[in-house]
C-alpha cells in the first residue's frame, strides 16, 4: 500500500482551487497536465459529486474510474471505484483552507492499495519517491490555477 501526504500553499483562493479540482470541462486537461486525454471521460455529474475515468500514460497506462465528492466545504475526496492497477477503496483527499493573508493551504493525501503486480510495483515506487513527485505535480497545477486568474 502507498500512502503519500503533502502540503503546499498557493496564492489562489480556496474557491479557485476547489473549482479546479471539480472542473470537468476541457479545461481540466490544461490545469492537470498529468491526465492522459485518451483515458479522460466524465461519466456523470451531480451538484456536489461526479463519476470520472482518468489516467496517466506513465508505466504503460494507469487508469481509474473514481467518485468525486465535494459536498463538505473545502474538501474534495476522490474514491477509486475501478482501476487497472489499484483496488477500489484507494483514494485522493484534498483539503483546502484559507491562509490568513490570502491564498490557500492545500493538504493532499494519496492512498493506493495494489490490485495486481503492476500496482504492487507502483505502490513500492510511490512509497519511496511519491512525495516529491506529487509535490511537483500539484505545485505545477497550482501555478496554472494562479496564472488563470
Would you name each region that the model predicts?
Residues 1-47:
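Hydrophobic ligand-binding cavity/cleft-lining segments
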Residues 29, 38-85, 140-144, 148:
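Glycine-rich portal/gate segments that line the openings of hydrophobic small-molecule binding cavities
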Residues 80-136:
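Beta-strand/loop substructures that line and gate deep hydrophobic ligand-binding cavities in soluble
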Residues 11-15, 45-46, 69-73, 95-105:
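A short, structured loop/turn motif at beta-sheet edges
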